[in-house]
Amino acid sequence: MSAADEAAYGIRAFTERFYTVVLGRYPDAGGFDGWVAGLTAGTLSGGDLASGFFLSPEYTGKNKSDSAFLDDCYQAYFGRAADAGGKQGWLDALAQGMTRTEVLDGFSGSQEFIALAESYGIRPFSGYGSARVAREADGIPIPVFPIPLFMLLAGLLGWLGLSRFRLGS
């Protein structure tokens, strides 16, 4: 199998996982092909795909509990069950007002998801790497943070109990 075939297979497998885990069904041809084309072209990131599935009327209409939502996140994003401590941290954050969209952003920015997405040749989230590439092209070294700085700040504020100062909505 050529490298291009392997990359195409990986993107298809990545997309199919979100259909089966998040929506609980096999993909429809039109939707599946659209997601795969966007990921292949780089116009969509893995985080875009994940948000599209988790925020879709099909998923939100299931009215899943926060616990079930997090179980789905761990399976879809990481391909594994939630660890007790990590899941409890997310449950606490949701109980204190964090939105599910913010949770999805946190999963998309995690080292585990970044590594997984990159292994499929997929950009983990919108804007990932773009500033670094542009600055390095100009010969300007920049620091690289393993997690986007705004996500670290949002997590720190939540940890400090200052959730009323949330970033975004």
What are these regions (language model features)?
Residues 1-137:
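Substrate/cofactor-recognition hotspot
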Residues 134-151:
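Short, threonine-centered small-residue motifs that mark membrane-proximal processing/anchoring sites
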Residues 147-167:
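A cross-kingdom C-terminal cell-surface attachment/processing module
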